[in-house]
């Protein structure tokens, strides 16, 4: 291998975001502000509002990025615009010095715009994240399709803003269609544009094809007469229609025009050029919309600019519509200009747009890759429900621009892509990729890189992995090159024009971290790239023995490591801060991030790498971040791996691991959970934060302080109180028993109920920090609206059920953690850390893991680390295999361990069984692989329930861990029990364990009383089915079938029952008992009122008198 890992240095991975936002601040914002009308008429006589957009001022906000995240606020800049209210003595449109009576000028706040942080993200309402968009480029497109045995040709003009204009040709002639309106004749269209016959004759090259269909179109016009004036206005009004600079450049190029880029509407020359192109278009090849020539990137700067345009239009409309002024009120600029229109437009984009999303901060690689994502969805883009396979497929023009490997595996496959490692975006939004110039077969590496768009690639371009000598000359006489971005041709080496700059130029950052990538199947490489982004930062991370060389740049460009801004000498180092004294004698303090939660609840923590007295250079990494070691990306651990079966524990991708990983905390990670509560105003009164909680023992409140908040540093378990909170009770909240006790004995139940914040189920850990956002109230520490956040740090060790993976898509779930003394061991006594299934390699075709595993073993024995670029065949055939065999030989010789390399079975070693000490029959492949712990922890997913909430409609247990739901027993599980004939188990599962309401209560009573479990009744889901069938108009009758008596079992009796009205006797008895309880309660209440008692006695006496009177009358 050659010594220099890269032919040229990689560009900054986050430069695209920063440059786009800088363009917005310097040019985009001022352009949109200058588009405002300088003088606006107000709905008050002789009053004008004058704006000064050239003099706008940006003022920084009062918060920092860290405070903005903690306080759920926005980190941004405020825009102030000078505005002047002019009182005139006459009704003129433009005020002059003569007719001015008074001027009031002041700077007005018109809105706030989020500011990009140093890591390339935005913080809006405490959340950070966004995504770039790839859309169809505005301009002219030709399409031909076969429809109803006819060729239908269309030329479409796509605008940056406004309607689409289509020119169509069919068997009846030439037509024009605006948006999806009815088509109109091309002659009517020209007439609507006020173009006369002379201009048509002089402007068009040939008019004969149009005249051929004129009579037919005039006949068809009688039945087709849309509102022509309104349609024409759609493409002529500059306020609603704009081609944009890109659309104008595209139109000029396609039509051979030279119209200024400042003209953003269609001119007469454009119309004539389009018609001429249309008439001769059938000789052209239809445009490919998936070609990157016809697609461009809308980076964040352009997206925010378009939102500002919407906001400023709303602001102008808002000023014009203001009518709430009386004649006596003195109007000031700040009363006319409102900041809400712009603020709401910006908030819409960051909060509810398809391009705005929650930033993936699982590790620093996932954050970097997230910022380089390109989405084809969103406003103006594709619809995920109606996307063709061609739109998702890899296009030849994506070479070196978009990664062909890294994309989501779900419904967004191919629609969300990632920028390639060397790609950059030019000022027009087109993706460029760099090349070296080649002259007479020599690569001119000393000359600057040449960046080309897909449009400019009309030359012969060679890939980076072709063979070359030490002087930079191409070795082979003939080379396979790309020509015009699509065709592959064999070219003499002296006729090659350009060559790619690096082997990893075509792939993304995540994919380029996979060593021996060329030996993996593309599907597994995709999984490997995606799973690296899911790796959890470990407590003790280690750099990979086998890497690709860009690990340090990924860590550096993420800005999650602390970097020295100036050279100097370290004066002070602690876990919280590093002080460096620079050459000028100034002391620079670098604050370190300590145990802060990320968006995915992983731990963001920095560790110092320098010591007092050390000399520091500019750009040196002085503190490691999460998932880094010594300034390099370190997401996992180097483990000793054996590929062998072990008693079925690694069947179907299951993985067997040693308990040494837990003992040495190799896969231990910290996760920080956030629990929050808020003081609210309820219907019954205001909630109170307190340590005095009713019906809660002192033992359960011992960890709370005097205010009722948990103390920092305490270890908490599920159900423990974090914040004591009580809520006033209402009359409705009281139980009938409590009301009865109160009525008879005067016993008072507490007027407050416990609504404390408790530790959720499945979470235990140490209280790390508490954030209190107070809204004080007279006499109270915490008023309504006060928030309290408790952060709990949970240490997560490796356990059965956790998901781990390599970098080649080889993933699996831990099936058993075996004592390290029972694991197979090497001849030198080293026990194996992890056992993988050898059947997982040939079918998945990810042989790269075998190369990595063996080179890692050689590196571990030689105490060396390797940086291997993919596609190494440029140096020698089978270069990877030759390198690994050579390094294993060197390790065996240097360490005096001949068993490390065997000529008969290279890479295989004869292992011994840790339980018996006996050697296995066959040699086993053993090596050192880099293994990651993924963010699919069994601790977050495992769940069990005995009783809990039920669905209101079906009366079945709800689903999901978050709702404390049950495990779904679906139809396939039912089939399994039916196959075994487990009738009683099945009946129990489908009735009393599911939705038999009466049966559930009866079973509970029988278990408490020690009685036999009764038979189940009809489940609620059957009743729901009956109601649904009745709703469809079906009259369904149900019968209860029974024998006439025990002796005569041949005679059956069918009794009709109504399930909707008649319930079991137990339910009726329950209803009767509830009615009796209500009667007793009513009597108890009446006992309190003497007047009611008297009236009751009177009523009884009257009843008795009437009864005796009737009896005497009967006797007579």
From Swiss-Prot:
Protein keywords: Chloroplast, DNA-directed RNA polymerase, Nucleotidyltransferase, Plastid, Transcription, Transferase
GO biological process: DNA-templated transcription
EC number(s) on file: 2.7.7.6
Biased composition (Basic and acidic residues): 1070-1100
Pfam families named in the record: RNA_pol_Rpb2_2, RNA_pol_Rpb2_3, RNA_pol_Rpb2_45, RNA_pol_Rpb2_6, RNA_pol_Rpb2_7
Enzyme class: transferase
Extent of Basic residues compositional bias: 1101-1116
Signal peptide (from-to): none
GO molecular function: DNA binding; DNA-directed RNA polymerase activity; ribonucleoside binding
Function: DNA-dependent RNA polymerase catalyzes the transcription of DNA into RNA using the four ribonucleoside triphosphates as substrates.
Assembly and oligomerization: In plastids the minimal PEP RNA polymerase catalytic core is composed of four subunits: alpha, beta, beta', and beta''. When a (nuclear-encoded) sigma factor is associated with the core the holoenzyme is formed, which can initiate transcription.
Protein name: DNA-directed RNA polymerase subunit beta
Origin species: Heterosigma akashiwo
Highest classification ranks of the organism: Eukaryota, Sar, Stramenopiles, Ochrophyta, Raphidophyceae
